[in-house]
Amino acid sequence: MNLAAMDPNTYDAQLEEKRIKLEQIFTDFDTPKLEVFSSEPAHYRMRAEFRIWHDGEDMYYYMFDKALDSKVRCDQFLPASELINKVMPALMEELRPNPTLRHRLFQIDFLSTLSGEILVSLLYHKQLDAQWEIEAKALKEKLAATFNINIIGRARKQKLIIDKDFVIESLTVNNEQLQYHQIENSFTQPNGKVSVKMLEWAIDVTKNSQGDLLELYCGNGNFSIALAQNFDRVLATELAKPSVESAQYNIKINKIDNLQIIRMSAEDFTDAMAKKRTFRRLEGIDLDSYNCNTIFVDPPRAGMDPDTVKLVQGYDRIVYISCNPNTLIDNLAELSKTHKITRFALFDQFPYTDHMESGVFLERR
């Protein structure tokens, strides 16, 4: 991470560079005007990870700065949420003088929410015992006087939870509240306010939809829960078990009654739709009963494999969220043969970095 590049005074300029770069990448495609959704210039990351450096009696957070090729002390961290920045010194003040909690501590992870909850994970190169648990409970009790906080201790093949291993995020999307169960050590959108803009964009491009929605790679249901209002039914797939459990939880707390989550990979689901194989996980689910005219995909950085691209091409309307414009371009080379891009967006999830989150909405030619 290049810490020197994180200067709010340069935010607008770096976003403009991304806009120009993304438009250049898409030169070979007929795209509408690029919609650009900016981030807060500071305190935008809802999660952060720090290594811990021990220096005699002192102990502090640090990160490795690639530009300097060295570690940099981080008593505060500009990109992290204001809540993380408030908890960082308060936590360290309690850890430094506590031999049980500081011994062989090598990393601290923070997961915060816009709604004011924070989860702190303490990672150790030692096994955690009953004394550690006593001290950690006392630590939580002291910090809980100021913060809505929970603590996790992690070591090899060990996880101790005090008292929860998740947070509940509450997002205001088009003036409505959506709640999301976010579990420790699983994927969540890092930039909370930009995530809201992404949800609102996806709702907008799919308004006035007919029929049902299929979503691949649904994670904790982040998009499918928000989009359920636009469709008769939603069928979503996700492979990671913790994410599926969170998605089921989120369906309940948001009182969504038209969303079905299936735990399976996009590749396996592609085989199931093509009737190449049968899967026990699909027992009781009549895929043929769904009338999916729209498909939503948010694949990993590697993009979609050729078979999944072929599956996606079978739908009249495609919403594609991408964290890697290069693999998006690769997939669009095939998708654009049958579909045209009618909406095009840049979401600045990761300010001051080269990463670009983009979205395209395609309709059959």
Curated annotation (Swiss-Prot):
| Entry EC number(s) | 2.1.1.-, 2.1.1.35
Q: Which PROSITE patterns match?
A: SAM_MT_RNA_M5U, TRMA_1, TRMA_2
What GO MF annotations does this protein's record show? rRNA binding; tRNA (uracil(54)-C5)-methyltransferase activity, S-adenosyl methionine-dependent; tRNA binding
Keyword set includes Methyltransferase: yes
Active-site feature positions: C323 (nucleophile), E357 (proton acceptor)
InterPro entries given in the database record: MeTrfase_TrmA_AS, MeTrfase_TrmA_CS, SAM-dependent_MTases_sf, TrmA_MeTrfase, U5_MeTrfase_fam
Q: Name one Pfam family in it.
A: tRNA_U5-meth_tr
- Swiss-Prot/TrEMBL keywords: Methyltransferase, S-adenosyl-L-methionine, Transferase, tRNA processing
Q: Name one GO biological process term.
A: tRNA methylation
Q: Which reaction does it catalyse?
A: uridine(54) in tRNA + S-adenosyl-L-methionine = 5-methyluridine(54) in tRNA + S-adenosyl-L-homocysteine + H(+); uridine(341) in tmRNA + S-adenosyl-L-methionine = 5-methyluridine(341) in tmRNA + S-adenosyl-L-homocysteine + H(+)
One Gene Ontology cellular component term attached to this UniProt record is:
cytosol
User: Which regions form coiled coils?
Assistant: none
So where does S-adenosyl-L-methionine get bound? Q189, Y217, N222, E238, D298
Q: What class of enzyme is it?
A: transferase
- Similarity-based family: Belongs to the class I-like SAM-binding methyltransferase superfamily. RNA M5U methyltransferase family. TrmA subfamily.
Function according to Swiss-Prot or TrEMBL? Dual-specificity methyltransferase that catalyzes the formation of 5-methyluridine at position 54 (m5U54) in all tRNAs, and that of position 341 (m5U341) in tmRNA (transfer-mRNA).
Q: What is this protein called?
A: tRNA/tmRNA (uracil-C(5))-methyltransferase
Species this chain originates from: Shewanella sediminis (strain HAW-EB3)
- The gene for this chain is trmA
